[in-house]
């Protein structure tokens, strides 16, 4: 659909008008805080701990708004009751969430953000991400390298990227190809969710489990995000839990929790010594009861290592898993015992911790501390120097190049014009381009070395007023696609003059 046709699509334009009214007309509300966890599918971890700290009232009379999909709303309300959280509004409607986003002063997320959100000057956006990476991601995960844009939008929109260790900072910025061009600040501080492991567990006593040896099993997500099969993991886990249940004694209890992306139900009623995580309590409060953590390829072990308690890797499907998902850290370099069957697992559960993890903790729990969330909010909201904050960048100007479908001829032209010695060269293309989606592995290998990629993720979404003012639409579309980034030059190598060309050429004229 061309630009003219989109400008005439009045029904959707009316919806966009409602969404972007805040962007164009409303002042930013200095007391409004917007938060979302896992794209609204969950409410746990860093985002939960930030809400918990904000609820103390130490940071002024703030209005706390949380976006959640309908299936997560009951969980949030249970947390409100058990933790006395001050949440002023739970937003379940997408359009409403985006409107509130556009006028919120403070924004916190641990993953993505509403796709129609456009960053505004004066907003403060903090991205905590959802864990130190073990598994390859971004450009390093070949199966999904052509979908970089899904993570780039919230990362580039951020004023602060939170990293609990130097390894995570370097790995993430390079994997998502923003290490040379991210214009915001790096917040070196502990993860809010990890502070619980540096304090005694209060939940074990509350649940009457003082005389129990507690095990927690938290397996990772399996599969490619766009091609999920929850039932496969559910069947595997259920089989192993059945075997394990018969081997545990009455003084032992195991709590099992599937990854949020594998939320298939398991019938726990048939087990004697195994239960699902108790509802109404934050995940890491439950995990902090554990004497032993059982996991596999999940980043949870980076966090739990703070407790200095035993970790077992139950990697029964290592060969198969590694066939489609690689690791930054070889499993054999991790200090934790690794088991492939229930017999080996039971043996380790009944054995004391027998490995040295001090170097691991020093590297991957580098900035974790009991006061992390307080330090973050003092820095972000109060403007205090409570955390280590750094900027990155190489001092070079940024150049943006649009090269269409990245045919061989276009790649040859790219190699002729790219100068990575003088500029940070950013390549953009349509994330949904069929030729690129079908041939991305071959194409990416041919691209010039040293360039960054920001995939063009969004179609035009005009409002009613923009139907008569395409310039405003093009300016907003550019800001949504390339938040916070300034370009010295923009080069359009195509002759199609499609939507992307119009957006980029409008930016050139504006400058």
What are these model-predicted stretches?
Residues 1-98, 392-486:
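N-terminal pre-catalytic "stem/leader" segment of glycosyltransferase-like enzymes
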Residues 2-17, 132-138, 150-227, 261, ...:
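A nucleotide-sugar donor-handling region in carbohydrate enzymes
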Residues 34-197, 461-510:
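Active-site and donor-binding regions of nucleotide-sugar-utilizing enzymes
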Residues 44-51, 56, 191-267, 406-417:
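Conserved catalytic-core segment of nucleotide-activated headgroup transferases in glycan assembly
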Residues 89-105, 260-302, 307:
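Donor nucleotide-activated moiety binding/catalytic core segment of transferases
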Residues 105-136, 281-324:
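A donor-sugar binding/catalytic signature common to diverse glycosyltransferases
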Residues 267-272, 299-365:
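Catalytic binding pocket for nucleotide-activated donors in carbohydrate/polymer assembly enzymes
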Residues 342-406:
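C-terminal amphipathic helix plus adjacent low-complexity
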